[in-house]
């Protein structure tokens, strides 16, 4: 077809088209706009994986972050050439290269001191710095980066273990959880905890609720919360329904 109106704002026009085609939700657009206003340093763990490298390049092109890709320089450059990707503006960090020895040693010293009471030694910590998840999360922990993306080569359970060791849980909490965001025609729903705590007691549910409330507000939504179990109206006097009842009662009183 032929456009009947002059297009003055091409960015807004592209957003409108993406919405019409179902490629972008209001929440996604808000996140992109926020990220563009203040792009952060994001570490992409598996730089040698095509999907991870494509994501880093696309994120740079969209202006939503300053990508830092972990991996072997030659391998990543070869892959980029095969995929016809430009690495301009992409920082590559080869964590195993001798040039990174000083940083590995600094990270190992910080981690071993942090976990000394758990029996961690400098030698063990230094060995871990050759692993991308430990190295990348130490970048975040020390302020060398702002966020870390991983998971293509490792199970989430292993990633969680490293995150607890390196970054840890906020002092006011004893538990943490994961959240999935569901975009539907009726609106956006935040679901937690979807992966971590299999049989949460009331204390765990309270922590999950507080963390969820904080996260939902971060996304500029007003939280209206519901807790689900397998029993209604006190029909079951033990198990998760009791935990849910205790957690809801606490949240209402506090």
Task: Indicate residue ranges for each PLM-predicted region.
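Anion-binding alpha/beta catalytic cores of soluble intermediary-metabolism enzymes, centered on
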Residues: 1-254
């Amino acid at each position: 077809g032929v456009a009947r109106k002059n297009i003055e704002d091409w960015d807004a026009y592209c957003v409108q088209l993406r919405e019409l085609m179902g490629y972008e939700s209001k929440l996604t657009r808000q996140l992109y706009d926020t990220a563009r206003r203040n792009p952060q340093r994001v570490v992409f763990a598996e730089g040698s994986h095509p999907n991870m490298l494509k994501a880093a390049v696309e994120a740079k092109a969209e202006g939503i972050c300053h990508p830092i890709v972990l991996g072997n320089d030659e391998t990543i450059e070869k892959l980029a050439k095969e995929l016809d990707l430009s690495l301009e503006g992409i920082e590559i960090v080869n964590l195993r290269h001798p040039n990174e020895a000083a940083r590995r040693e600094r990270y190992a010293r910080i981690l071993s001191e942090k976990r000394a009471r758990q029996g961690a030694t400098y030698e063990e910590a230094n060995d871990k710095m050759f692993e991308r998840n430990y190295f990348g999360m130490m970048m975040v922990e020390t302020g060398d980066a702002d966020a870390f993306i991983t998971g293509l080569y490792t199970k989430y359970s292993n990633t969680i273990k490293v995150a607890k060791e390196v970054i840890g849980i906020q002092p006011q909490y004893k538990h943490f959880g994961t959240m999935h965001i569901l975009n539907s025609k009726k609106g956006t729903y935040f679901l937690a905890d979807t992966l971590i705590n299999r049989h949460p007691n009331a204390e765990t549910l309270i922590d999950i609720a507080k963390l969820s409330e904080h996260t939902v507000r971060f996304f500029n939504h007003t939280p209206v919360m519901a807790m689900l179990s397998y029993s209604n109206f006190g029909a079951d006097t033990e198990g998760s329904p009791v935990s849910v009842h205790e957690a809801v009662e606490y949240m209402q009183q506090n």
